Design a protein with these regions (language model features):
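Compositionally biased, intrinsically disordered low-complexity segments
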Residues: 1, 13-14, 32, 49, ...
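Basic, amphipathic alpha-helical hairpins
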Residues: 2-13, 17-20, 26-41, 60-64, ...
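Terminal helix-turn-helix DNA-binding modules in bacterial transcription factors
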Residues: 30, 34, 39-43, 62-101, ...
Length: 131
């Protein structure tokens, strides 16, 4: 009878694998949070982590329950909402600061995410601040 790995060794191997997978996700989140204002390419992210793009996307989705693109959009929209509270910043400036080269595309994405345009959002925020 050959001596193979026991159950504890196998479980330990799975735990190490899970820890490594979570490390990739944490690293990816960190990269996104520090560079979401840049034009981020998912393939470039995979290259930075030395991972296959599909595998990286699968890991991220498994750990977070959302796609990399959805997470990136969420971070950009959260930042845009904060920036739009400054009446001195143009929508075009906010768009560029959040990684959107095209302010029209940004406005459509913002409207889809929040259900109102950036201009409407700003008016609501400023109106509420005056109350």
């Amino acid at each position: 009878m050959s001596e193979g790995r026991n159950d504890d060794q196998i479980i330990s191997g799975f735990e190490k694998n899970d820890l490594l997978q979570h490390k990739y996700t944490r690293t990816l989140i960190s990269i996104i949070e520090t560079s979401f204002a840049e034009k981020i390419n998912i393939q470039e992210l995979a290259n930075r982590l030395h991972l296959n793009r599909s595998y990286m996307s699968e890991l991220f989705s498994k750990d977070t329950g959302m796609s990399i693109k959805s997470y990136l959009t969420e971070k950009r929209m959260q930042r845009a909402a904060i920036m739009l509270q400054d009446p001195n910043r143009s929508v075009k400036n906010v768009a560029a600061s959040c990684g959107f080269e095209d302010s029209l595309y940004f406005s459509r994405a913002f409207s889809k995410y929040f259900g109102i345009s950036p201009q409407q959002y700003r008016r609501q925020i400023l109106k509420n601040e005056k109350k």
